[in-house]
Structures are given as structure tokens and as C-alpha cells.
Amino acid sequence: MEETYAPRCSMPAELHHPYSKFSDWKFKLFRVRSMERAPLPGEMQLERGALSGVVASAPLGETVGDVVGLPGSVMKLWLGGKSKENVEGPGKRVDLKLQEMDTYMNHLRCLCRLCGGALRKAKGPEHEVQGLLDEASMSALRRVGCKATSWPEVILKVFKVDVAGDMEVVHPPFFCQRCWTLAMRGGGFCSFSRTHVPGWRPHTTLCLLCTPRNPHYRGERKRRKPTRGAQHLAKRTKWDLQDNAAIVGEKRAWRTVIDPPQGPGLRPWVRSSVQRAQWVKSITLCQKEHLSARLLSEDLPVDFLSSVTCQVCDHLLSEPVQSPCRHLFCRSCIAKYIYSLGPHCPACTLPCGPADLTAPAKGFLGVLHSLPLLCPRESCGEQVRLDSFRAHCLGHHLEEVDGDHKSAENSLDNFLPVNKGGRPRQHLLSLTRRAQKHRLRDLKTQVKVFAEKEEGGDTKSVCLTLFLLALRAGNEHRQADELEAMMQGRGFGLHPAVCLAIRVNTFLSCSQYHKMYRTVKATSGRQIFQPLHTLRTAEKELLPGYHPFEWQPALKSVSTSCHVGIIDGLSGWIASVDDSPADTVTRRFRYDVALVSALKDLEEDIMEGLRERGLEDSACTSGFSVMIKESCDGMGDVSEKHGGGPPVPEKPVRFSFTIMSVSIQAEGEDEAITIFREPKPNSEMSCKPLSLMFVDESDHETLTGVLGPVVAERNAMKHSRLILSVGGLSRSFRFHFRGTGYDEKMVREMEGLEASGSTYICTLCDSTRAEASQNMTLHSVTRSHDENLERYELWRTNPHSESAEELRDRVKGVSAKPFMETQPTLDALHCDIGNATEFYKIFQDEIGEVYHKANPSREQRRSWRAALDKQLRKKMKLKPVMRMNGNYARKLMTREAVEAVCELVCSEERQEALRELMGLYIQMKPVWRSTCPAKECPDELCRYSFNSQRFAELLSTVFKYRYDGKITNYLHKTLAHVPEIVERDGSIGAWASEGNESGNKLFRRFRKMNARQSKTFELEDVLKHHWLYTSKYLQKFMEAHKDSAKALQATIDTVGSQETQEDADMSLDVPDF
């Protein structure tokens, strides 16, 4: 028998191992019906009248088999691809056993092969049991010495289960993420936890998967509900409505062909001939390969016919084999049947395996081969023996082919479009892509051969040149010029990275960009902007999780996987038994993966810095040090009236970082050489988001749990070196973290100190409020993270058995365990806001002459405040605000503002005191606000101690009514600690939290832009968009295409509504304003 070019003819003569060619089998398993309906070359020959194998073409009234159309695969049927063609057989009689197997297979696909649990309950992707190891898993296992390349090898070593012989009808094809985790933790050799692997058995009538047992179930009182995992039959299509009458008549006819049940619990079954027709359609697929018994020229007895026909397909026997129960089958049909439905005889259901099949007696074979068949060709009508029937039909086919060639040479019809009738021939451009490929198949082959021979295989250039010549010949010169420009690399379209930069910097959501892309393409006729899928491809290289890297030594308690994107903020938190689930929604990047992406974003700047310093590129592969500024701040309530999700408080907390500098310790140099320094350390463009969480910053327990994994990753990175490819060479980096971008409230939260109203006023020294008011300038920085930890242990254990007040005085205000190390410094932005708040209150008191009055009433204070607001609005154009913000503070702390206030102060002496106080403050302010005070304001730095001493004298004398025994937190830090911090760190302003506060404003805008119903997806969108917004790579494209961005913003309304004043101003909460 010749080999037929069709996927279903690949079944071997004997039953082979079920997974001998797993990839080929899997391809056949997931065939789409449109693929199966496609006319293959072998089938096209059959349509023209030729037989491949032992099949001959039939006249109009006859068919060679029960050919109704190309049927589907039985495995497709079992895997849920059910349709009217493959569920219902001839006469639409349903094969109940195949439906039952379909349900059973659906249950198996929902379970884990190794633990038996439901796949939907295990968070994470599912993995193929017979698949190959992915790159991440293989690299992780290679590091621990496992050289396995496929999952069956790993499963055999870890779970002691051989899955190489699994069958699709018995074993689940997937295993869950939990079992994957166990395999990875065991290094591919062993399992550290006991996993009971269930023993999978074939499907039976009383299968526990299809009909699970329930001990509380009473069958006689309540009807059992269908199982949850079972799939329902497909809905009836509109084609089924035409045969309603036939279906009703068929149901009535079934009663005549079904044998009555033999017992009270037995179900009736369909007649054997109908069952065989269904097997042909769904299992054997031999309609065009085996001969029908209707080709017999004589009217033979029924018993004789049953002896020469196959008990599976009802066709004449082809390569007959005999079972132990003396039933006869075609060799290929019984092999497919046993593989699909199990090793038993189709006729009597007795056990029958592939090894039990034998060849029938020679006498029977002689009778079978001598059967007379009638040739189905109309012009022939001869009676041909069965053994010579194939040669006879092949001769007819060769004659027809020769005749076609002669007629084609003698006529001009060969040059006309081929149309065999039916629908009129459509134009090439109106066809589907698949039909276009089919029509141009020969031309494509010729062009490919020419390109390989003449142009080195560049088929694209050949096709574009042909198109260009066709346009020139048709005088389409404008379109030809555009095509030629595109071929030369100077096309009209923008680069995908440019389009991504425009989308991010103009705050366009994906849907808004897609509408703009379609509008521009439709109106201009050119594809200036790139489609969304190209932008998503460009995004992948810029987001964390794209670049490979390595830590030496490996980070403790951190996964070695490099390709990790946005994860749950609580992942990595080791929960104890007593912990309750966190009432929060949080999303973050893994800290080390985010740092790698940020460094790759600075790759060009780092290489340029090496060249500017005259350092040899290949020699600088180690000794890199990276300084990181960390910032964290709560944003207050940003809740809206719409949106779904868990009822968590909508008080976001943002944790971000900024790469401040990159330096290298070159060989032979005493000091490190700085090759990159962030030019705008307080810009929102350089402050990269790491974590977003909906949590109240006052909730110490939840905040500790959310930031705990970040702290663990941060501490692990301090003791390891990062190996990363920069500039084509692997280089090692060490990271130094400085937590400086925190306000007073957040510092006290992280360091375990009492709240801002505590007696212990300062987070830098141990002074009380009374001590700080008596001695305003002579203090030094004494607190540290390690000291706070030691004091917490004293507070927790009380080793000296002291009273509460004595113990509190000993630990200096430490009341909780510090969980994140912060740098003992002063935040410049919040210092400005806190001092401006204090000056605002001084102005009120001076207007009301509080130095004369003991206890003014609340109404009097309100009137003074109203007068001050009115004067500032009139003279300074300053609108009153509910809470002090950065913009208001900058305008209030000026000489113009104090002059406006002096107009409301009656005493000349008090006016001069106010002017002197503001003048001293204006001279002191640049020292803590400038990025590098030694270079930018050296004179103010030298006079700072004198000015602060004079400032303190004014407060303790002229304004003694307000500062007698008390002083604010930020005024104390301003007067006492600024010179020491500047001498130690070189700057205060560069390490401020202003970039993170500006990012809070961006958060509100991104949230409006990406308003999805789920808070989880909303945080992911905001985090991803904000990261892209801070990309140096995209900022360079934005600088080069400013005009494109301005034109886009002028033509498209990106937000749809004006920004509120709350978003326009940087709103920062300060208590008691």
C-alpha cells in the first residue's frame, strides 16, 4: 500500500510507544478544523479520480467508502473539540461512550499529574509533563549540577515516578506550580517534602472523577447536580434547526433498532453497524483507504459478508488480522481502536492486545483475494479480483493524466484563469490571507528560487523591487518614492521607541494611542506611528525582567530567576501561623531586577563616563560602586467613587529609588573616580518606582509586612556583587543604599520611634523638647539604626526592672522594632514646608499682638488668619490652602511676603524683628537646599553657624512668648544639625524626597489614565507606565522629537478634563497647619 500524503495516514502498522514522537503527535492533537478541511496534495489527486493505496474514484451514484467529508481526529474529540460532525454519527446517533470519555478527559486536564490537586487552586502556570525544560528552569537546575533537559527525567529523580509511558486517556498531561516548586527546591535530584503521587487508572463505569462519591448523598430523595468541571455540549447552531423533523423521526426510529435491556440497571445501546460507522468517522479515518463492501459484484450471503469485512470499520478486510476470539479486523483499524479505546475486542469485548493478533489461515486469504469487485469507472464496468484491484484503478489514473496533458497542449485554455465552476473567481486582493497564499504558491516558489540563486536569499528585497518597478510603470511615483525611502531606511514612519516615548510622555493609554494611530493612518494614508504590538515589544526591553544577570554570591532567600516582572508586593514575606491575611493590594518589582534594568538604562552614560575619564574599556570590569537614594511616602486618601476590588483603604504608599552616582576604583588610584552623577537628583524623571501599595502609612504592622521583602532583598544585596553585561563586557557592581527621602513621620515609623508629638523631638539626637528650646544650636547627631535596635531590645526585655518612665527615658523614645535602616539626615523639602508652617503661625501671632495677650480665643485667631490670607492674596497672589504645600512654602518664605505682613503689624520694633528673622532664614536656606553647597553657596555655608546662632537668639528673646520651653521639630534640626550633616555627606538638598513627592502627582495622573476596574491591574498599569516615564532611553528620544510630541499634544485631548489644583500643586500633609 502506497503512503498517502495526509496526517491521518501516519499511524504505524503496529502499536508503537504512545510518546515515541511526542511533538508530532501533539501537533496532530491540536489540529484546527480549518486545517483539516484544507485540500492536501494527496487529496487533490483523489478528487481528480486517482486512488492512493487501494482506493478508486466512484461514479456519481457510488462512493468508495462512507465518505461524508474529512472527519476530525478522535483525540481532538476527546480533548473537547466537539462538533456536530464528530459527536453524531450517521443518522445523527450519538456515541455515548465517546461523550463519556470526553468528560473524563476534561477532568484529567484539570488535575495535577503528581499531586492530584486541581490546577486552578495552585497559583502559577501549569507545566507539561512530557515537555522540555524552559530556559529559566534549566539554568537554575544547571547551577546545582542537574543536567536534565526534559521534565520526565526530573520527575523520575524527584518524585520517583516514570512518566515516559503515560497515556492521554489515563494520566493528566500537566503538573501544577506547587510540584514545580518542589522539583526546583530539590535541585532536580530529590524532594524535601513528601508528595503522595496518586495511582491513575483507566476510566470505568463507576469512575470517581465523573461521578464523585458523597457520603451525605441520598440518591432516592435528591437528584445529584452535575460536576463542576464537566463541559456542556455545544449550543445548537443555525444549521441544526433545518433538521428538527428528522431528529424527531430519528428518535422514534431508535426504538426499533435498540435491543431491549436485559436487566433492571442496564442501558440500551446503539446497533453495531451504527457504532462501526461512528468508529470510522472518529477513530480509524479509513473512508478513503479501505474498500466498501458495496463494490462486490455479486449478492453474497450476509454471514459470508460479515466474515470478509472488518468488525471495526465495516469495510473489506485490508491486511487482515485475527483475534484470539476468532474475529477479523484490518490491521490499521484494530491498532487505532486499541490505542484509542483500550485492549479489548470490538465485537465481543474480550481482552485483546496488539501482541495477541495473528494472521488468518491461508485458505481464507485465498478466498478473500479472489473476491470479484466491480470497477467504479463508468466507461469500464469490469469485474476485477480484490488483489489486482489496485493496479487496475492505477492504470485508469495514468490514462487520465496523459489525456489531460495532451488536451492542455492543444488548447489555449491553459493561459486562462482556472475556474472549475461554483463561485466566480475573486480578485486577489479580496481573498483571505490563506487563499492568497494558495493562489500565489507557485509564484512564491519561483521568486524564492531566484532570490537564493541571484540575491543571496534576500526574498524581501526582490519582492519590494518588483513592487517598486510596478509602481514606476504605472506612474505611481509618489507611492514609489515612499517605498524607495522605506527601503533605504529613511521612511516616513517613526521608530517604535519614539512612538512609545510619545505615548508615555503625553499620558496616552493604549486605547487612546490606538485610536490616534488609526486616525493618522486613515487620514494621511501613511503609517507614521507604529502599531501597538511594536510598542509592546519595545516595552519589554525597558521594563525590569528582560536582561540576564548574576549575583556572586547568590542572594539569600531570593530567587535566581532573572526574568521576573511585576509581582505581588507580599511575595517573599514569610508568614507565621498567627498572621492574618494582609488587608492590602500591592504590586512591585523585585529590587535586584529593578536595579539591573535601571543600570542597563544608564549603559550609554556609563560608557561615555569611562571614555571621558580616559579609562580603558576592557580594563574596567570590576570595582564599580552604585549609590542609591531611597524614598518612601504616603499620599493620603485618593479614593474615588467607582471601581471594584477588595475594600482596602485607598491611601497609597510609594517606595522608589534614584541612582545618584556610579563610580569605579581604578587600578593604581587611591580614590574612586565618579563616571556618572545624576544631574537632576530631585526630578521625577530620575526617581524610579519600585513598589505601589494601598496601605495606611500609620498601620505599622501592614507597612512592615509589605516592606519586609524589600528590606530582605536590600540587605541581601549589600553583601553580594552584581555581574552584569555593560558595553559588551561583564562587569561587577556593588550597591550602597541611603534611605534619605523620608519625611519625619515615615522616619519615625521605620526606626520605631514615637510619633512627632513625642517629648523626644529629634530623630537625629536624644534631646527633649525642653532641652532643644533652651539650647537651640549646640547638638550633634547621635542616633543610628543599630543603636535604635539595641534600645528596642532594652524596651522589650527591661533588664533593669525599671518603671515605665525610667525605661522610656533610658531608650529615648524607641517604642517599636526598627525594620528599615534610614540615613540620619534632614529632608530638605519637608524642612521647607515645616518651617514655612511655623512662620505662617508667627505672622498670625504678630498681627494679633499675642506678645501682649495671655490666651487669645479661637475666634480671635480665626480673624487674624483671615486678615493674613487676605493680605497675602492681595499683595502676593497667594490663595489660601488647607494644607501647606511646596509651592506655597517657596512663595511665603520671601522678603516680599514679610513686607506684606509688616503692613499689618503696628509696632516698628516687631516689624524689624520679622524682617531680620526672614533675612537670616533666606541666607541659611541655600545651605540645605542646594545640591552641592560647597560650590554653589560657599559664603552662606561659612556664615551658617553665626546666622543660626543669631536666629536662635531672636526666637528666645523677641519671640519668647512662642518658644519658651518648646520648639518645632524642623526648626530644631535646621538650627542644630545642618552644618554637621553637610560636612558629613556634602549635601542635603541632593538627597531630598522632592522627586518622590513629584512622583505622587504623576501617580494621580497615571491612575486616571489607566482606570481599570480591578485595583490590582490598576496598580500594575500605573507601575509599568511610571517606570517607562522615568526611562533615560525614552527621554533621549523625547528630546530628539519634541516637535512630534508638541504636535500630538496639540491635536489630541489626552486626559479629557482639566487637572485639579490638588494635582497641579504638590500637596503635602503637615499636621497642625
UniProtKB/Swiss-Prot annotation:
Entry's localization field: Nucleus
ZnF RAG1-type span: 371-400
Alphabetized CDD domains for the sequence: RING-HC_RAG1 (cd16530)
Annotated keywords: Chromatin regulator, DNA recombination, DNA-binding, Endonuclease, Hydrolase, Metal-binding, Multifunctional enzyme, Nuclease, Nucleus, Transferase, Ubl conjugation pathway, Zinc, Zinc-finger
SUPFAM superfamilies (UniProt xref): RING/U-box (SSF57850)
One term of GO molecular function: metal ion binding
Record flagged with keyword Transferase: yes
Matching InterPro entries: RAG1, RAG1_imp-bd, RAG1_Znf, RAG_nonamer-bd_dom, Znf_C3HC4_RING-type, Znf_RING, Znf_RING/FYVE/PHD, Znf_RING_CS
Positions of Zn(2+) 4 binding: 375, 380, 392, 396
EC number, UniProt record: 3.1.-.-, 2.3.2.27
Cofactor note text: Binds 1 divalent metal cation per subunit. Mg(2+) or Mn(2+).
Reaction(s) catalysed (UniProt annotation): S-ubiquitinyl-[E2 ubiquitin-conjugating enzyme]-L-cysteine + [acceptor protein]-L-lysine = [E2 ubiquitin-conjugating enzyme]-L-cysteine + N(6)-ubiquitinyl-[acceptor protein]-L-lysine
Protein's GO biological process: adaptive immune response; B cell differentiation; chromatin organization; T cell differentiation in thymus; V(D)J recombination
Family per similarity comment: Belongs to the RAG1 family.
Subunit structure: Homodimer. Component of the RAG complex composed of core components rag1 and rag2.
UniProt-recorded name of the protein: V(D)J recombination-activating protein 1
Species of provenance: Oncorhynchus mykiss (Rainbow trout)
